[in-house]
Each structure stands twice: as C-alpha cells, then as structure tokens.
UniProtKB/Swiss-Prot annotation:
GO biological process terms held by the UniProt record: L-tryptophan biosynthetic process
Protein name: Anthranilate phosphoribosyltransferase
Broadest EC class assigned to this enzyme: transferase
Cofactor(s) this protein requires: Mg(2+)
GO terms under cellular component: cytosol
Annotated organism of origin: Bordetella petrii (strain ATCC BAA-461 / DSM 12804 / CCUG 43448)
Residues binding anthranilate 1: G84
Binding locations of 5-phospho-alpha-D-ribose 1-diphosphate: 84, 87-88, 92, 94-97, 112-120, 124
Residues at which anthranilate 2 binds: R170
Length: 343
C-alpha cells in the first residue's frame, strides 16, 4: 500500500498511525532522496510531534537495514552490538566503547556500530582513533577483524551512505527526529544480541519491542533514571529485556551487585583525550567510578551476549576480566589488528 507524503502528514496532524507498508514506502522515498527538503522536514517533525509508534520505527529500521552496506559473518546470531542513542547530555566518557573490550575479553563477539560525536564530548569513533585504532576498514576487513580479535567496529557513515539524502534536512532542523533512534537498530552485521542505552525512559519499552519485531535474540535496553543512556551508578537503571521472544521490564540498582551508588560527576569529559584517559584507567583496573561503571555495563553486555545465566555472574566475570589484564590486552590487540589495514 502506498501513501503520499502529504497524506502521511495529514495522518500525523490527526495523531493517527502510519501503517507498516506505508512507512516502508515513505522511508524508501526519504532514503532515495525522492522528497523535497520541505516535505521531508515536515514529515519528520510530524512524526516527532505525534510520537513515533513501535510499528513505524520497525518499518523505518527495516528500510535502513535494506539500504545499509552489510558486514557478512558466519554467525550473526552470536554477535553483540553495544551502543546508545546518545543525546543524554551527560558528557561522560565512552562507557559502552570501553565495556566492549571487557565483554570481548570475556568471550562475547562484538560488532559495534558507532560514529563521531553528535551531542557528546567524544563519540565512539573519536575515542577509538585517540586510542590508536584505524577505522577506515572495508566491510570485509571488519568481518576479518571480528574473526581474528572478537571485535569489529562499523563506522556508521561508511555503512549508511543513503543517509546523505536526509543529512541536510536533519542538520537544518537541529532537533531530534526518528533517525536519532534508528541508528542503534540498524547494525550492518545484523548482530542478534544487543545492549542499547536510550536517552528517554519511554524508549526502553519502545526499542525492546521494535527489536522483538525485527527478530533479535537477546536484548537489554537501559536508561539510567538520572538521565544517562547507560546503566548508571548514580541511580537505578530501567531495563527492558528481550530473551527467548519474551519481554520483561524491571529496574536494577548498583547495590544489588555490591556497587556503591555514586555521582557521575567524576566521569564527565570535555574532549576525546580526556575520554581516552578514563578508558585506560578503567581497563588498567584503577579503582573508581570509571572502572565500576564500565564493569556494570560490561556485565550487562556479557549477559546479553549469552555467556552467563544471570547479570550477577556476568558482573563478576567483567571484574575478573579487568583485574587479570585481559580487557586491556584486548584493546591493544584490536587497535594493532586494525592498523594492519592502513594504506
């Protein structure tokens, strides 16, 4: 079923849903550059004001995946993505990027999808470059890196070239649109497992249901009640879990796992160099907030990656992986391997 952009805009104004096939059609028009900037911006704002539904987001994510340049691996059902929507305004160091080295050292194969800073002080690509990684890898080289080191990093702009057709509209609008929540749903390696941080509590229930419809295996969507798009030490964390096709929503607290509840002030950074320092401190097992929040998020990733039966077991494994030096060694191994491909 097709729908014109004008008809879709009328639906948004009347707070009525755009159906799945209609949303597929509209997204394909957007990704092919077949809408004028005026109509595209009106539609994106209409969806935002109406509030995007699970069905609309699912259809949009399917189209973005359709247009993406894929990374082909033998076992996508075992891969884990760790990323956040960003936009939480917390300006903390790159927690999930650090945690991926811990999870990988614990045996979880990582296919991380990320980019440069949009609203934070340091995006995942920014800090990985500061740590010495080469990110200009072809899809085949990313797949090789996953096979060899247990980690692959997919630089989002390199895999979503069709986004160039909506980039000027997004930039001029300067506010969040559906695309801010689509990035973490469109992993080019089709990773079936995921730890995703979200900037708003409402997105916990929404994103977990979208990934259920998209066929994910084991997913944890997290939002710190202090506003972080990570599991937080400064508050309880809301969790939406998809496992074996079933969804559960609950809260976790640092004290549940023997961690102290502490402010996140000590892990705020102004640039990628400051973020790099905290990454190294955490992986070098320097006691403090940076190490503990990395361990907490790595524990959730290890659990989402199906290495343990409980979050508690996964957190113990995360601390062990940091303290025995294997997480820091994984960082060095990954960076060295990516540099093999430098021209």
């Amino acid at each position: 079923m097709t729908i014109t952009p004008a008809e879709a805009l009328t639906r948004c104004i009347e707070h009525r849903e755009i159906f799945h096939d209609e949303m597929l059609h509209l997204m394909r028009m957007l990704m092919r550059g077949e809408m004028s900037p005026q109509i595209a911006s009106a539609l994106l704002m209409g969806l935002r004001v109406k509030k995007e539904t699970v069905g609309e987001i699912t259809a949009a994510a399917q189209v973005m995946r359709e247009f993406a340049t894929p990374v082909v691996t033998p076992n996508p059902q075992d891969l884990l993505d760790m990323c956040g929507t960003g936009g939480d305004g917390s300006h903390t160091f790159n927690i999930s990027t650090t945690a991926m080295f811990v999870a990988a050292a614990a045996g979880v194969p990582i296919a991380k999808h990320g980019g440069r800073s949009a609203s934070s002080s340091s995006g995942s690509a920014d800090v990985l470059e500061a740590l010495g990684a080469n990110l200009t890898l072809s899809p085949e080289q990313v797949a090789e890196c996953i096979q060899a080191t247990g980690i692959g990093f997919m630089f989002a702009p390199a895999h979503h070239s069709a986004m160039k057709n909506v980039a000027p509209v997004r930039k001029e609008l300067g506010v969040r649109t559906i695309f801010n929540i689509l990035g973490p749903l469109t992993n080019p390696a089709n990773a079936a497992n995921q730890l995703m941080g979200v900037f708003h509590p409402d997105l916990v229930g929404i994103q977990v249901r979208v990934l259920q419809r998209l066929g994910s295996r084991h997913v944890l969507i997290v939002h710190g009640k202090d506003g972080m798009d990570e599991a937080s030490l400064g508050s309880a964390t809301l969790v939406g879990e998809l496992k074996d096709g079933e969804i559960r929503e609950y809260e976790i607290h640092p004290e549940d796992y023997g961690l102290s509840m502490v402010s996140n002030r000590g892990i705020k950074v102004a640039n990628r160099e400051e973020s790099r320092e905290l990454v190294i401190q955490a992986l070098d097992n320097v006691e403090g907030v940076a190490r503990d929040i990395v361990a907490l998020n790595a524990g959730l990733a290890i659990y989402a990656g199906n290495k343990t039966d409980t979050i508690g077991q996964a957190l113990s494994l995360a601390f062990e992986t940091i303290s025995n030096g294997s997480a820091r060694a994984k960082l060095e191994e990954f960076c060295a391997y990516t540099r093999k491909f430098q021209k």
